[in-house]
Curated annotation (Swiss-Prot):
Name by which UniProt lists this protein: 4-hydroxy-2-oxovalerate aldolase
Keyword Membrane attached: no
Record-marked site positions (Transition state stabilizer): 14
Catalysed reaction equations from the record: (S)-4-hydroxy-2-oxopentanoate = acetaldehyde + pyruvate
Alphabetical UniProt keywords: Aromatic hydrocarbons catabolism, Lyase, Manganese, Metal-binding
Length: 352
């Protein structure tokens, strides 16, 4: 049994933004942050779903700017630290400085699981600002445990004090998680913390988070009602209930989280955050969870099945940042269906 305090990192106001196409109002953000703060989570991540400056044609326009959301949270929190997410190439060090000035004190610098080298500038600048810098290795199922650990070691060398296994596709099994944390332990300094960011596409979000803690993981990402991309993240209230049952020290107020999940967050969902045919396809095919809403829009526009688009994206091993390829895949599928339709027509012949 683990006796250490588990660091609870809430992502409702960042990853959860994907579930409602980045349309949180400032008042909703303020209300949710206040509930989370009173429930004593350790940090609250705030940004567009795709991180600082993610609001764009490619990723979807936000109802407000990142700074407006961060300032709203800063106006109500008294206990939790404010975190934000930055993807190099989308957000810049100038955006990071603005987020710091607005109240963010932790930045998770996110890269694809094989591209840790592009995080150097941003991690170093975060440390220069006095921020806590966290390395966030997305789509972790696409790398071997040892390969992922070497990428984490790079982030550590740049100044990251915590490195995450990020299951962006919700595709990792419990053994997959176990092996990745053991690989991290083999190469990272003892003082470098580790974290798990799970998605629930195979219904393993909570189970994988528990396995991570059993393997010595320090931090768990979770969200109220699982609010997040795809089938959502590990539901915060469910993970906390499980941790409570196991006698783990989490420091949060379970009933307050349960009330916030059902009374405040779940009613905001315009599409239920759950495991269904489409979100299951994400986990099965190992597809970036935030592709869901974009793929549904493309399927509706071109008269296709969302699942077919997602499975093809997985076959092509598309990764975060390639949202523009979703329409290309849809058009290719449409062309293929038309080709099959033409060649399936019976050929008429004239009798002699």
């Amino acid at each position: 049994m683990t006796t250490k305090k588990i660091y609870i990192s809430d992502v409702t106001l960042r990853d959860g933004s994907h579930a409602i196409r980045h349309q949180y109002s400032v008042e909703q953000v303020r209300t949710i942050a206040k509930e989370l703060d009173e429930a004593k989570v350790d940090s609250i991540e705030v940004a567009h779903g795709s991180g600082l400056q993610g609001s764009s044609f490619n990723y979807g326009f936000g109802a407000h700017t990142d700074l407006e959301w961060i300032e709203a949270v800063a106006s109500v929190v008294k206990h939790a630290k404010i975190a934000t997410l930055l993807l190099p190439g989308i957000g810049t060090i100038h955006d990071l400085k603005a987020a710091y000035d607005a109240g963010a004190r932790i930045v998770r610098v996110a890269t694809h699981c094989t591209e840790a080298d592009i995080s150097k500038q941003h991690i170093e600048y975060a440390r220069h600002l006095g921020m806590e810098a966290v390395g966030f290795l997305m789509m972790s199922h696409m790398s071997t445990p040892q390969g992922l650990a070497q990428q984490a070691k790079l982030m550590e060398s740049y100044g990251a004090t915590c490195c995450y296994v990020v299951d962006s596709g919700g595709a990792l099994s419990m053994d997959d998680v176990r092996m990745r944390f053991r690989a991290f332990k083999d190469v990272l300094k003892p003082e470098t913390e580790t974290g798990i960011h799970a998605h629930h596409n195979l219904s393993l979000g909570v189970a994988n988070s528990i396995v991570a803690i059993e393997e010595g993981c320090d931090r768990v990402d979770a969200s109220l009602a699982g609010m997040g991309a795809g089938a959502g993240n590990a539901p915060l209230e469910v993970f906390i209930a499980a941790a409570e049952r196991m006698g783990w020290h989490h420091g949060t107020e379970l009933y307050k989280l349960m009330d916030a999940a059902d009374d405040i967050v779940r009613p905001l969902q315009d599409r239920p955050v759950r495991v269904d045919r489409e979100t299951l396809a994400l986990g099965y095919a190992g597809v970036y969870s935030s592709f869901l809403r974009h793929s549904e829009a493309a399927a509706q526009k071109y008269g296709l099945k969302t699942m077919d688009i997602l499975v093809e994206l997985g076959r092509r091993r598309m990764v975060g940042g390639q949202e523009d390829m979703i329409v290309d895949v849809a058009l290719d599928l449409l062309k293929s269906l038309e080709h099959e339709r033409i060649h399936a027509q019976p050929v008429s012949s004239e009798a002699g």
